[in-house]
């Protein structure tokens, strides 16, 4: 318990009291809007020099404090004298300023943690989407059970504001944040319904992403704290990214609560071989032990979300399955563990007997049906996977049309190059190649056969060969066995920070 109290005091000492004054700094809004909005919105003519005016921000904040919230309803939002006709623009001004300011202490904390761990150089690689798959290849083949969990949302933003107060001691800033959220829309409606929170996320993407990521980081910090305290093996590799917040500080008599109410519960969670992976709005929990322990963790997550974050989590969104008999989706891939059985004949003296050997291998398969559905939605093919032309691109030059198709094909090839079976990937590339040819033929008002005969089918679109083969052919001879082996094996790219729009994980 001494260690618990020391860490709590150390976490509180890191809190800063400087956020509210930063809202009135001009460079904050210049940083937020230099690339996204027209600067004329914020410029005022002051002599010969033009600078970002903070009069708009100060006037908005003053009116927010003078507003009578009991008179205005959600239906009168369009007639709100505070927002007027510039409601959307000025609400984005404040929200972007909030997002920039509130990210500063967390970014400084992350930078100091990375410097202490001396992993600054590898931090960019750790951000890659593909960095998760080598980890799964090494770990998941040893596990027996997996739980695919959907992170519940939306969460009431007042809960997030209260949690933020444990990180940063700045009462005026949080009062202003509450006022802004109230003026933006009806507080209860856009927080408790998916349609309203979707509207909020589109109009205020930076602030919404920060609040959502903070919510995820908060529950993960609690999860990792319990896991580290209850396990024989510590998760040293993850300590640098998730600060453990001691959430029982909200209760009185901290020592008594931890000693009495929680010491017995921790005995259910002792498992040195349990792994947690989060991606987008889902997470995966894998374990080698019996499903009894997985059920314990399932109930733990449900009570954590309901008791601490006051968000409802339905039990059916957390499924526990045997890994060898179940496949699940992860970042656009289908994952399952294939068991290979082999028989070895052994002989000892004059006795001969057979030995069965079972070898597990992680399979990552390209989901061909969701990809074809995404291609059909983007008008590259029909629902059956037959390529069609893209008439909306016919006004572009031939070079631009080919370049667009090549970029899509190259991005998909890079993203799915870690697949165990490349046949589905080749089909996707065939659809894009033929769709490109049909688009060019449509532009030149010709048939596909006549267009290929006139332009030459061998020279046209030769860049549709994978970029990996061209690069590897420069390193190894074309008849090299190493090149053949690399083409069959998986290649992960540690520079992929975003998934392609065609990658559908639903």
From Swiss-Prot:
The protein's superkingdom reads: Eukaryota
Share an example GO biological-process annotation for this protein.
tRNA processing
Q: Report the subcellular localization.
A: Plastid, Chloroplast
| Assigned GO CC terms | chloroplast
Q: Name one GO molecular function term.
A: RNA binding
- What main location does UniProt list? plastid
What is stated as this protein's family in its record? Belongs to the intron maturase 2 family. MatK subfamily.
What task does this protein carry out? Usually encoded in the trnK tRNA gene intron. Probably assists in splicing its own and other chloroplast group II introns.
Question: What's the name of the protein?
Answer: Maturase K
